[in-house]
């Protein structure tokens, strides 16, 4: 998964600190998989850019075992073209579900 990101990429996950660099990003996504996330659906709402930078705006839905809905929300990704290859450079998302206890 980390291979999709630039070498100095950053994640900005819901309810979490910034995750920086490919090693930390790989560890983060491995933790997501270990936590029970089995699938993700992304719905792209907008894409635009110029030169070697582009952005993508969309919605996501995460599912667990048996297709059980785990989370849904929205995201923005900044893409960067590095040596002719588009990679994720900044990846931010947040849940649309209410926080527990609220």
Predicted regions located by residue number:
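Short, low-complexity N-terminal intrinsically disordered segments enriched in polar/charged residues
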Residues: 3-7, 87, 99-102
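Short beta-strand segments enriched in hydrophobic/aromatic residues
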Residues: 5, 60-62, 92-95
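A short gly/proline-enriched turn/hairpin at secondary-structure junctions
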Residues: 4, 9-20, 31-37
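Hydrophobic pocket/interface hotspot
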Residues: 1-2, 9, 21, 25, ...
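Surface-exposed, charged secondary-structure patches
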Residues: 24-69
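Short beta-strand edge/turn micro-motifs at domain boundaries
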Residues: 72-97
């Amino acid at each position: 998964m980390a291979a999709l990101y630039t070498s100095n990429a950053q994640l900005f996950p819901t309810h979490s600190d910034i995750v920086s660099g490919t090693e930390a990003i790989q560890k983060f996504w491995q933790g997501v998989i270990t936590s029970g996330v089995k699938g993700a659906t992304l719905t792209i709402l907008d894409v635009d850019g110029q030169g070697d930078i582009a952005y993508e705006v969309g919605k996501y839905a995460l599912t667990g075992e048996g297709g059980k809905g785990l989370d849904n929300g929205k995201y923005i990704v900044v893409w960067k073209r590095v040596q002719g290859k588009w990679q994720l450079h900044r990846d931010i998302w947040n849940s649309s579900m209410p926080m527990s206890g609220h």
